[in-house]
């Protein structure tokens, strides 16, 4: 899946980045992408993920690749430190976006489960199996 491709590439880049705040943030990014992959395993085309896979993650990977090149040049100056701080902030932002996407997808699942349960309860009551073992139909 697209998510697995990005997890693999981000991990690959992360292994060569010694900056702890960046690596910690990227570990979280990969964990969140794994959760997202699990949630979307059996779902077809989800518009919430289109921007993530078509825009956000490609830009993040591109920024990480450029950062790695700068880091490998061993020239650590104010511009580098400013760029590094911006990258850290961006990783925090993308992780928050991933959490929001995961949360909204779980909300959809909860609504679907509740709708299924409600429908099943109505059908059971209609067919004469209406006694509620928990006493909430009183």
Report residues per predicted region.
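Long amphipathic all-alpha helical oligomerization modules
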Residues: 38-138
């Amino acid at each position: 899946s697209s998510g697995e491709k990005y997890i693999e590439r981000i991990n690959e880049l992360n292994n060569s980045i010694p900056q702890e705040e960046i690596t910690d943030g990227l570990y979280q990014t990969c964990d969140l992408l794994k959760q997202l992959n699990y949630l979307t395993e059996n779902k077809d085309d989800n518009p919430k993920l289109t921007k993530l896979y078509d825009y956000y993650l490609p830009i993040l990977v591109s920024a990480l690749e450029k950062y790695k090149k700068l880091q490998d040049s061993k020239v650590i100056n104010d511009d580098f430190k400013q760029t590094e701080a911006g990258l850290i902030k961006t990783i925090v932002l993308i992780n928050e976006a991933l959490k929001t996407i995961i949360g909204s997808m779980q909300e959809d699942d909860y609504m679907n489960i509740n709708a299924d349960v409600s429908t099943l309860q109505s059908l059971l009551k209609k067919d004469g199996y209406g006694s509620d073992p928990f006493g909430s139909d009183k």
